Regions:
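Beta1/beta-strand and adjacent pyrophosphate-binding region of the FAD-binding site
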Residues: 1-10
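Active-site substrate-recognition segment that forms the wall
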Residues: 15-23, 30-32, 44-45, 81-86, ...
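Short loop/edge segments at beta-strand edges and connector loops
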Residues: 31, 125-126, 172-175, 303-305
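Dinucleotide-binding Rossmann-like beta1-alpha1 core, especially the glycine-rich loop
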Residues: 45-128, 132, 288-290
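Short beta-strand to alpha-helix junction loop
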Residues: 60-64, 96-103, 143-162, 276-281, ...
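Helical element adjacent to the flavin cofactor pocket in flavoenzyme catalytic cores
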Residues: 142-192, 196-200, 210
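C-terminal catalytic lobe of FAD-dependent flavoproteins
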Residues: 293-372
């Protein structure tokens, strides 16, 4: 029986562990529960098809991520996990300019040819838009995509962790101190004064991954980008089926059950692992959110979450073995699309580790791209 160690149990590590365990492998997950885990703070909008980002490798990854969700949710339900935080509530992308909405709808229709999961695409008037998400300003029309979904990062991660445990995965809440090395082969991990051995060590430590790789002389340049995300509450309002909202600025608004509305997020570079909720961050989020959805001005501020998104220098995730070493795989840099692509990349990572075929052309995501 092959043994695998996964270091870091955010969305990516939790998914990799689950898929390895489902395939019958022996899996140990090591996670030290740092504050500021990106997955824990994040509220995911699963609607990659309207993006104007031109990078084809990135789009293939997020498209695969969105497509895989319903299948994964079914697998988790078969494992008795129904609290996944995922719901296909549809998405609306807002704009004041009708021409921009036309172009957006055209882009979605073109992409639907190889992504039927997009579902129905409709251009909605400001009135129709507001009827779907009542707090919105009446200035915005929208493109509605029925296949859009939301996901609660904390809930999907915990569902994957519980399901991985049911399939025999061992979880250790400790710091993975260092990798065990035999010449150029990685054979395990030092944890809590003991050694855990494995055929493959998979590092999915997000913004913290460099710590394990530095002692090997590997300069893995993944940096944290700080996100602050605000949770609001609307009294006596059923928000459970409202669509996710993508305004024309770089923010998002989405609702969950029981009146909870999430608005975010900041994109703060070069502040390191600063966990503070800042006046400027809250001001930026709320001023942008209330401009788009003035009906939220009477909502209660419940909490502000902070997470550190891992980014590579080229902003494209990396996944693969580290050249010059055997038994060592890294996957990282999911950035702001981790909840869209993470579960799918975890499946790809499990297949890669087991020597099975992957769906993506993984050479496009070589870890060399994040080496300095």
């Amino acid at each position: 029986l092959k043994k695998y160690i996964v270091v870091g149990a955010g969305i990516l590590g939790a998914s990799a562990a689950y898929h390895l365990a489902k395939a019958g492998a022996q899996v140990t997950v090591i996670d030290r529960k740092d504050k500021g885990q990106a997955t824990d703070a994040a509220a995911g909008i699963v609607c990659p098809w309207l993006s104007q980002r031109r990078n084809k490798a990135w789009y293939q990854m997020v498209k695969g991520g969105a497509r895989y969700y319903p299948e994964l949710i079914k697998k988790l339900e078969d494992d008795g996990e129904t609290e996944t935080g995922y719901s296909k509530v549809g998405a609306i992308s807002l704009h004041k300019d009708p021409e921009k909405l036309e172009k957006m709808a055209e882009r979605a229709a073109k992409r639907r040819e190889d992504a039927p999961e997009i579902g129905e695409i409709n251009i909605l008037s400001p009135e129709e838009t507001q009827s779907l998400f009542p707090p919105l300003s009446s200035e915005y029309g929208s493109v509605h995509v029925s296949g859009g979904a939301r996901v609660n990062g904390r809930a999907i991660r915990l569902a994957l962790v519980r399901a991985a445990k049911k399939n025999g995965t061992t979880f250790i809440e400790e710091n993975a101190v260092s990798l065990v090395q035999d010449k150029k082969r990685i054979t395990g991990v030092h944890v809590n004064k003991q050694v855990i051995e494995a055929n493959q060590v998979i590092i999915t430590g997000g913004a913290w991954s460099q710590e394990l790789l530095s002692p090997l002389g590997i300069n893995f340049s993944v940096r944290p980008q700080k996100a602050q995300i605000i949770h609001l509450h609307l009294e006596n309002t059923d928000t459970s089926s409202w669509p996710v909202v993508m305004p024309p600025n770089n923010q998002y608004i989405l609702s969950f059950e029981e009146g909870r509305v999430v608005v975010g997020a900041t994109h703060e570079d070069d502040v390191g692992f600063d966990l503070r909720v800042t006046a400027g961050g809250v001001h930026e989020i709320l001023s942008k959110a209330l401009e788009v959805a003035p009906g939220l001005d009477e909502s209660t501020m419940v909490e502000t979450r902070v997470g550190f998104r891992p980014f590579t220098p080229g902003f494209l995730p990396v996944i693969g073995p580290i050249q010059g070493y055997e038994g060592l795989i890294v996957a990282n840099g999911l950035g702001a699309s981790g909840l869209t692509s993470g579960p799918f990349l975890g499946l790809e990572l499990a297949n890669l580790a087991m020597g099975k075929e992957t769906e993506l052309e993984l050479q496009l995501y070589s870890p060399e791209n994040a080496m300095e």
